Amino acid sequence: MKAILIGVLAALFFAVTFVVNHMMANDGGSWYFSSSLRFIFMLPFLYLFVLIKGRTKFVLKHIQQEKKAWFIWSAVGFVLFYVPITFSAEYSLGWLISGTWQITIISGMILAPLFVETVVINGKETIVRHKIPWRSLLISSIMFIGIIIIQIPQASQIKLNLFLLGFLPILMAAFSYPLGNRKMMQVVNGELGTIERVFGMTLVTLPIWVVIFIVGVLKEGLPSSSQVVQAFIVALFSGIIATILFFYATNIVKDNQEQLAAVEATQSLEVVFAIIGEMILLGLPLPNGLSMIGVALIIIGMCIYSFIDHISFGKIFKKS
């Protein structure tokens, strides 16, 4: 329950990404700066946190020992996650991006067989491959249907080319984020805390963000002061607060695939928060009745997940 509540809070701060990225795109800001500045701004904050804890050398040593794994999975979890999101913001609305992003509800569970763990069976260490948590997948399906329903009224008004430019990059991001996050949890194997892991991932991907920023300057010129401020807001609320909260929540339940799926599913509430945010900040209209049905399904799915530890799935599925 604790991990789920933290996940919900993370979803609230993550929603800032979709709303503010939409605002930046409306103001003519380039995705080069929206993506790179977020992580460039994140690094000093994270470094300060790790420095205060006196863990800087330990993190750097861990990176040195696992350089290849750190770079590959940090790039997958951060670069292949955020570049597509900011790119899509130039072609789609924040609510549609946040809705499409909820494919992570399903992708995280589909990726489960890619991960293994070592367990002791009859006194011997045995490598066991994770299985897809089908029960959690069923609950997530309820939420996913709700997300689809939310998008139907608005998506029907969008041209196909804009839909594809907004959808395909997010599809990549939706698989990259949980894959990178879970792989990095395996790499650190509990040796680093959440903030230390996020700091390390941001640090090793810094060269990529710098290159993206330079390319943006060469193609678009320097970013406007408003985009810099907005990117800073995203870095603080989504990059620092939301990322740390979410990674902390997933770390709590990392050894339980169903609970891990439940935490990842809390991110579906980003859609609700994004809709509210765009109504307040961008003046978008209140969703119609069909969309509200979708919101209700998302909330129902979250309620089921919230009490997952108190429900005997064996009794529920016994006769199915």
Feature locations, PLM:
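Hydrophobic transmembrane alpha-helices of multi-pass small-molecule transport proteins
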Residues: 46, 113, 131-154, 289-309
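C-terminal-most transmembrane helix of multi-pass membrane proteins
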Residues: 119-122, 258-320
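Specific transmembrane alpha-helical segments of multi-pass solute transporters/efflux pumps
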Residues: 13, 56-101, 149, 237-255
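Glycine-/small-residue-enriched transmembrane alpha-helix faces in small-molecule transporters
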Residues: 1-37, 140-141, 145-148, 156-186, ...
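Specific alpha-helical transmembrane segments that line the substrate/conduction pathway
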Residues: 33, 40, 86-131, 258-280
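Hydrophobic/aromatic residues within transmembrane alpha-helices
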Residues: 24, 34, 87-89, 114-116, ...
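Transmembrane alpha-helices of multi-pass small-molecule transport proteins
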Residues: 27-80, 107-114, 142, 175-179, ...
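Hydrophobic alpha-helical transmembrane segments in multi-pass integral membrane proteins
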Residues: 14-16, 80-86, 145-158, 205-220, ...
